[in-house]
Amino acid sequence: MNTSILAPPESLLEAQKVRLAIREGYDRPTAGMANGLTQVNMISVPQDWAYDFLLYTQRNPQSCPVLDVIDAGQFQSRLIQDKQHDIRTDFPRYRIWEYGQCVDEVNDATSIWNNHPDLVTFLIGCSFSFESALLNAGIEVRHITDQRNVPMYLSNIPCASAGRISGNMVVSMRPIPAAQVSQAVQITAKMPRVHGAPVHIGDPKSLGIADLSKPDFGDFPRILDGEIPVFWACGVTPQAAVMRSKVPFAISHAPGYMLITDVPDQAWML
């Protein structure tokens, strides 16, 4: 890989330690871990569905920004230098999908993967990767403060279909003080490879979200007086497409349980 985009040695060591802890059974959301390093979503689909999925990601770059594609039979990413890493073990939690239904959650997907050797894997940018920039600007990230998972919602925003794949956008939400919303927009707009600027600010009902306290994925948020809900496109969108399109088989990360890479967040800053 291009070592010029790697994080400094001390950060690489931290990433390696986190991946090892996950491999050995750590099972919690990864927001705030290995601060400053890129985290990624994952979706793995059978080879005969891979082109449709690739086209789907290209038509929906804000919600599905592809950072790497891993061929069938391969289990390592160009985003990680450490040769011990394995995408089958280095996410804290995986979801197993059959015909659009989540049938299981596991912490190690190796044996399941062995039964499906034709899976092609897409690593998708994650909004966790702009959170260090928000924190550095003095903007609180509430789910990190509260040590909870980020709230995510299935919106009414349709994605552009591709072949057999269709679905609506999933959005993540962060409550931001009104006086800091414009700054949060400016910061995240500079990072389009990890979802970029918000897709909506304010009234959740405009997105088809009836109750913010009941996210479709993640934990319910704590919103304080004077804060505005701000919504970003989310890399869980491919899972919504799996559900809608009834893909025969797929493996994904569990929402909020990401892979830590060796690439610094700043690598995606324009």
UniProtKB/Swiss-Prot annotation:
- Gene3D superfamilies, sorted: PSTPO5379-like, PSTPO5379-like domain
Q: Which UniProt keywords apply?
A: Lyase
Recorded hits in Pfam families, A to Z, give: D-Glu_cyclase (PF07286)
Q: Which GO terms describe its molecular function?
A: lyase activity
Q: Where are the transmembrane segments?
A: none
Which InterPro entries does the record associate with it?
D-Glu_cyclase, Putative_hydro-lyase, UPF0317
- State the superkingdom: Bacteria
Asked whether the keyword Zinc is assigned, the reply is: no
Annotated SUPFAM superfamilies: PSTPO5379-like
Which EC numbers characterise this protein's activity in its record? 4.2.1.-
To which protein family does this belong? Belongs to the D-glutamate cyclase family.
Q: Which NCBIfam families match?
A: PRK05463.1
Q: What is this protein called?
A: Putative hydro-lyase ACIAD2519
Organism equals: Acinetobacter baylyi (strain ATCC 33305 / BD413 / ADP1)
